[in-house]
């Protein structure tokens, strides 16, 4: 007997990309306090973001109450959809969340961590390490096995673009819009929304932008928001953004 294809739904194999919330401690009180501190200042940046709880950074034998962490994330308006764990962490299946497989090789770059506020990662701070601005828009390292995605339309508030390789945007990214890439991001227009590069732990990824006015910028989990205003010499200017020793460095670009 043959079965007709349903006109109403299909079940197909596929994959869904999500960001990782990496748990580094079993002290849930400290974790809760840090969550509140981290997100109360900029709640809208992460509202309704889908995340997977990553417990691979915990030491062997350590366990946490994943149901409590799930509730913590719900309290800050994030949506946990699964758990990423080592094969030896069988207890992770007890939370009632599905076990997910992460593609990253470094083992846990979670939701972005803020750049060190004690040393603002701006062009002035990077002067000693890089005395001259970068000469051109060029990717720092190729992303293997993934095609570059090119977007030539404006992105409005609420829209999101995800690229498995490098991402090139040729139109403005408005407030409330989000662009995410596993590789580098090139924006040949004003960036007023959020840009997250190297989201699966690519510390060599960079962001290149001809007009920097962002809500948030992030590379490999290290992020910076407008809570820490950008200096006048890079705000609205052409820049490149890279990581140096876990700090975001924002440097002018020489385009002529």
Curated annotation (Swiss-Prot):
Keyword Cell wall biogenesis/degradation included in the entry's annotation: no
Top-level taxonomic group: Bacteria
HAMAP family in the record: MinC (MF_00267)
Protein name: Probable septum site-determining protein MinC
Alphabetized UniProt keyword annotations: Cell cycle, Cell division, Septation
Subunit record text: Interacts with MinD and FtsZ.
Species this protein is from: Burkholderia vietnamiensis (strain G4 / LMG 22486)
Family the entry assigns: Belongs to the MinC family.
BP GO annotations: cell morphogenesis; division septum assembly; regulation of cell division; regulation of cell septum assembly
Biased composition (Low complexity): 120-142
Function noted in UniProt: Cell division inhibitor that blocks the formation of polar Z ring septums. Rapidly oscillates between the poles of the cell to destabilize FtsZ filaments that have formed before they mature into polar Z rings. Prevents FtsZ polymerization.
PANTHER family: SEPTUM SITE-DETERMINING PROTEIN MINC
Region (Disordered): 105-143
């Amino acid at each position: 007997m043959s079965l007709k294809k349903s006109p109403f739904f299909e079940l197909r194999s596929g994959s869904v990309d999500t960001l990782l919330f990496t748990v580094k401690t079993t002290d849930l009180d400290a974790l809760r306090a840090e969550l509140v501190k981290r997100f109360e200042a900029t709640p809208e940046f992460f509202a309704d973001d889908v995340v997977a709880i990553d417990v691979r950074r915990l030491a062997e034998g350590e366990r946490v109450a994943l149901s409590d962490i799930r509730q913590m994330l719900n309290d800050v308006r994030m949506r946990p959809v699964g758990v990423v764990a080592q094969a030896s962490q069988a207890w992770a299946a007890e939370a009632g969340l599905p076990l997910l497989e992460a593609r990253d090789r470094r083992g846990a770059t979670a939701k972005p961590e803020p750049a060190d506020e004690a040393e603002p990662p701006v062009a002035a701070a990077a002067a000693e390490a890089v005395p001259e601005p970068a000469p051109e828009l060029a990717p720092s390292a190729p992303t293997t096995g993934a095609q570059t995605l090119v977007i030539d339309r404006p992105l409005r508030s609420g829209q999101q673009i995800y690229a498995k390789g490098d991402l090139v945007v040729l139109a403005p990214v408005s407030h409330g819009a989000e662009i995410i890439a596993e590789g580098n991001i090139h924006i040949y227009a004003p960036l007023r929304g959020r840009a997250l590069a190297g989201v699966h732990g690519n510390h060599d990824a960079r962001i290149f932008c001809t007009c920097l006015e962002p809500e948030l910028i992030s590379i490999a989990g290290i992020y910076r928001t407008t809570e820490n205003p950008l200096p006048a010499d890079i705000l609205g200017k052409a820049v490149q953004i890279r990581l140096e020793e876990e700090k975001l460095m924002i440097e002018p670009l020489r385009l002529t």
